[in-house]
Amino acid sequence: LCYAIDVDAINAAFLMGMAQMTDQWAVPGSATYNDSLNHFTYDPEKAKSLLAEAGYADGFTTNIITISGMSDMLTAIANMLDEVGIHCNIQQVDSATNNQYMKDGTWEGLMLHFATIAPDLGLYMGRHLDKNGAYYAKGIQHPDKEMELLEEIRRCMDPDEKHKLEKEMQAAIYDAETGSCLFGRVLYVNKSSMYKYDYVIDDHATEAFTACWDLSACWLNK
């Protein structure tokens, strides 16, 4: 699946080429982004080869669940998957039903994964990875390695050691060669434009998640 999706084409066609692309639970350049991962690339032939290796040389059929606002993008993704032999039935649902699937883990097939990408995997990834998590948790596997790392991250008091553990978690899940791919292929980080007066200095706007945005060094040059 991950090799079958052309993320740059999705960005250009549906996000005006303005999305911040990523391939793990972090913004590139942030404290928890792991630069050493093996990355997924758009490689349909490799996708076909891996499907055959897994016993699906003739492909298979599954569902893609989407809300109306994302249906065009999901249809494009379905077409890409179809080219490698993964045939998808598009199932459009309302937001309430989609949210219930996320909470109950009762979806069948594929659906989008919405998550808060912030530099605290113990909290934000924990909402989805923990067996008692609020969203998606009831519909995914919970491998021992990832669960042990999650608990270590939550208990860690040293910031540097915590970031090291968080990068280990990124590798455990998102490395193209060895990762468990629990949450599928990450596409992009949603962001919006911010406008400010040019005399606002050292505010670090857009560089941090709002909940941990530090304005202590900000000053006005006027």
Can you name each region flagged by the protein language model?
Residues C2-D35, S68-A78, N99-K222:
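Detector for C-terminal structural segments
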Residues H87-Q100:
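Early extracytoplasmic/lumenal segment of secretory-pathway proteins
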